[in-house]
Design a protein with these regions (language model features):
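Conserved redox-cofactor binding core of oxidoreductases
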Residues: 1-73, 276-277, 283, 288
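Hydrophobic (often cysteine-bearing) scaffold residues that line and stabilize catalytic clefts
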Residues: 3-4, 48, 52, 250-254, ...
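FAD cofactor-binding and catalytic pocket of flavoenzymes
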Residues: 15, 92, 133-248, 252, ...
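A glycine-rich dinucleotide-binding beta-alpha-beta segment and adjacent secondary-structure elements
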Residues: 21, 34-39, 68, 74-79, ...
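Alpha-helix capping and helix-loop boundary segments enriched in small/acidic/polar residues
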Residues: 43-50, 92, 127-131, 135, ...
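A short acidic-Thr-Gly-centered motif at the start of a beta-strand
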Residues: 57-61, 91-98, 289, 295-305
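Glycine-rich loop(s) and the adjacent beta-strand/alpha-helix scaffold that form part
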Residues: 62, 71, 75-83, 88-160, ...
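A conserved FAD-binding loop/helix module that cradles the flavin
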Residues: 319-341
Length: 345
């Protein structure tokens, strides 16, 4: 889009190095439905190449793959020795069911995967399934994130789909702070309605639309650091979260440096909103990967150190959060686990 090309040139003149984002978007399929942005919106069609449109649809084409929907997995059962999972127990339509298999992969997300394994405690695994290290549920991480609006009152933003560029000039440790600050990427186009709903004070719709017409939304991400006391727990059947924020000094430095870049690039009005603990930004870390069974939950192939046929294939296994979207890394680790299974690991 011409407007985005102009923003890119302005950023380059301001001294940063914007690059194109990797996108799993079929733009033609998306825009066929409606001329709307896609960032933060689900899509029931095929415009957004999410897990369902991509790998799940391909997997379901195989005759030996099936999907059970509306099922709430309550626990995994093991043999008497606790070395192998023999069944997953789930509830569907008010009834309890069991499904047996040779191997089990847990991929419910950093909170729910940890909770499932903690609920699956037994005589052989009193602290939770696969938790001899006492690391299960610990080291919960959730990115430090801020939304930034850069507004140019003299130039309209005509983009429909704008989440296409990012810059990492402040990511590496070669700055005056001595440690990484994070990633900056465009948000999807902020509409007047979105802006009106998120403004800290009430504002008329016309004012929100006017602001949105001249605004570019940016998403700033910094690492959350692993802390054993940031954890997911299960008490009386309920999930309990205890998250201790970290690395906010780096995030505040990222905000300051990015604000300076935007102003240098010709955006005199820069507004920011740092998200709190209610915002789930790439949760990870609760079943960390590692070579040492005493300090990690799964091995380098995402297999449980304690249970030979149990794998965890979601962001739970990430030992650090980095400061970028984790989906491609999670996919790569799942492929690595699949390769290990096919080798008979």
């Amino acid at each position: 889009a011409p407007a985005l090309a102009a923003v890119r040139r302005r950023l380059e003149k301001a001294g940063v190095h914007p690059a194109s984002l990797p996108l799993s978007i079929d733009i033609e399929a998306w825009l066929k439905r409606a001329k709307t942005g896609w960032d933060a919106f689900p899509n029931t069609g095929t415009g957004k190449i999410d897990a369902e449109v991509g790998p799940l649809a391909s997997a379901l084409a195989h005759p030996n793959v099936s999907l059970v929907t509306g099922a709430d997995v309550t626990r995994l059962e093991t043999d008497a020795a606790g070395r192998r999972v023999i069944a997953a127990v789930y509830r569907k339509d008010g009834a309890e069911h069991r499904i047996s298999a040779g191997r089990f992969a847990v991929a419910a997300g950093a909170v729910q995967s940890a909770a499932l394994l903690l609920r699956s405690s037994s005589t052989a695994h009193p602290a939770g399934l696969g938790n001899s290290s006492d690391q299960l549920g610990r080291n919960f991480m959730n990115h430090n994130t801020t939304a930034m609006l850069a507004i140019d009152p003299f130039a309209a933003n005509s983009c429909v789909y704008q989440k296409t560029i990012a810059f990492n000039d402040f990511y590496n440790a070669d700055n005056e702070y001595g440690f990484p600050l994070g990633n900056v990427q465009l948000l999807g186009h902020i509409t007047g309605n979105i802006l009106k709903a998120n403004l800290p004070v009430p504002a008329p719709a016309w004012f929100a639309r006017l602001m949105a017409r001249h605004a570019y939304g940016w998403f700033l991400t910094s690492e959350d650091l692993p802390n054993p006391e940031s954890r997911v727990m299960v008490r009386d059947g309920r999930i309990v979260m205890h998250w201790i924020r970290s690395n906010m000094r780096a995030h505040e430095a990222l905000i300051g440096k990015t604000r300076a870049v935007m102003r240098k690039a010709g955006f005199p009005i820069v507004l920011t909103h740092t998200f709190g603990r209610k915002t789930t930004s790439h949760q990870c870390g609760t079943a960390r990967l590692g070579a040492d069974p005493q300090t990690s939950v799964v091995d380098l192939d995402c297999r449980s150190h304690d249970v030979e046929n149990l794998y965890v294939t979601d962001a739970s296994v990430l030992p650090t959060s980095a400061a970028v979207n984790p989906a491609l890394t999670v996919a790569a680790l799942a492929i690595k686990a699949g390769a290990a299974i096919s080798r008979g690991h």
